[in-house]
């Protein structure tokens, strides 16, 4: 942990509420050497403009030529497009390379509670390293986000399954509809995360499973959930608002009717295509964001860094085929 704190200490941290490291450079994945990987960070700030102002003064080399636009314009680029994250990538700190994304507290709150973009919220479905510890309000947001991930995964599973199957669904949620899983990402990524982080996933999700009255963990090989219409209706109602909005929009469009969310959810709970409907809704949020945020990342990184990063991703993809 000290290594990661040292890496992020090059940034101005006065406005930072929370920072975590994620990805294969910080969290062990099966058959991967994390010491060789670039370390990914997310930094949550209460004042994006002030963060960029201080960071440009301290670390101008972290930015592309966009820094010349000034901190006010960088804040606008960050907070008004795609998943509301601004990334600096391929930054050299000592012997390691880091990439860090900056997001405002208000935007991360929106993503964790409502799944507005399923971007930072998706990264926090999985185990991360808390480099700057979150305060109580942020802890509550992260827990609620993971509870939503558990409900979503359970709606995609049958009445009986294994813990490994559950974790596979949870980890896979944020890749649903992501075009990078077709081109640019390791095809075995989800499996590697689950295999390399089983104990951490258990630590994160066991308390949430214990709190769920409609779920029984008999053993790692046998988990049973209540598959009644009442239980499904209950879980559907606990999904984040953006997922419910997508479900309502998709079902009304398919049936050429205009019904309110409550009526749509009640109807869905009685159908046999709940899993497919929920998965389609989640993918409908992630798909456009995966395109727009990738384009934004390339824009903020500049041409040279974007080409280097894309080539590294493509190499990883080809090795996994």
From Swiss-Prot:
GO MF annotations for this entry? phosphatidate cytidylyltransferase activity
A single GO cellular-component term on record: mitochondrial inner membrane
Q: What is its main location?
A: mitochondrion
A GO BP entry is:
cardiolipin biosynthetic process
Pathway noted in the entry: Phospholipid metabolism; CDP-diacylglycerol biosynthesis; CDP-diacylglycerol from sn-glycerol 3-phosphate: step 3/3
Cofactor note text: Magnesium. Also active with cobalt or copper.
* UniProt EC number: 2.7.7.41
* Family matches, as InterPro entries: Tam41
> In what way does this protein cross or attach to the membrane?
Peripheral membrane protein
The prosthetic group or cofactor this protein requires is: Mg(2+); Co(2+); Cu(2+)
Q: Which family does it belong to?
A: Belongs to the TAM41 family.
PANTHER family xrefs: PHOSPHATIDATE CYTIDYLYLTRANSFERASE, MITOCHONDRIAL
Q: What is this protein called?
A: Phosphatidate cytidylyltransferase, mitochondrial
- Native organism: Caenorhabditis briggsae
The organism that produces this protein has a lineage beginning with: Eukaryota, Metazoa, Ecdysozoa, Nematoda, Chromadorea
